[in-house]
């Protein structure tokens, strides 16, 4: 590394305590290029609060380079230089450990939020549930739910007129050029496919293909969305998210190809709270969901080999937590708890530590 003064589009702070902490093996972090600095911040972000914290000047600098290179850290930092509730910020939702979820966050941070709100299209599905509950399984889809009324009609019309320009904010400036961080580059390889059920297209982020869908929902009416502090887009609220999962489980629990992921999502939601009666009522206004839930639980409990397959295919990080949730659901319905395998008794984190 040479000693030539680094030319930058903005001023580098005099001190970079957090960068120096996560780059302890680098004698002078200011000799790193901006892209190298950003890469170190991205890879070391989960050490916030462990190795140290950025100063206010360093936070402003991180935000500047994140915006300049369109990094996923933009969404992590939120709308101001310093995240709200910074004492708890990293411990709760400041960093997604799975790379695919970091890349999903990159896509979310480039969407046209005004368009989503106007169409009442809300982020949901299993990816939302996993990202909200400790990333217990690896989900590679981005699913938005849009009501079957004026919302979906507006969505279809605008997408037909403007294509990707309707869905993405500043579509022409998406991070795909040479100056952008390789891990953050977005490619939209195909045309948008639309029909009466939804619109869909693949998104490639840093070489990883993510399936993007905006689904027309006619079975239930959505309430007001929620805005988690990690999400740059509106999300299904708790009632609607659980109602959607109850409906999805009722539709497809008998199929082994689904790998019981709707039941597993419900189990992890149950760890956080009892299934609200409002969610049950909303789902059952469409069709029966509790009897299929009971049958899905029995099917899952009775087949330990099938459960193992589900854990492997879905990359479940903590099977013991899944069974904790399954047992709560079972007890809610008057069923016995699960006879556990060894894998379901001891946390994988404990085994690997």
Where are these regions (language model features)?
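Amphipathic protein-protein interaction modules
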Residues: 28-53
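Short alpha-helix boundary/capping elements
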Residues: 42-50, 66-73, 271-274, 291-292, ...
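Non-catalytic, well-ordered alpha-helical scaffold segments
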Residues: 13-20, 35-39, 56-63, 260-267, ...
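Compositionally biased terminal segments of proteins
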Residues: 12, 76-353
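N-terminal acidic leader/helix
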Residues: 3-35
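Alpha-helix C-capping/helix-to-loop hinge sites
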Residues: 25-26, 44-48, 145, 249, ...
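Short, charged early-sequence alpha-helical segments and their helix-coil boundaries
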Residues: 51-80
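Surface-exposed polar/charged interaction patches
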Residues: 22-25, 29, 44, 68-72, ...
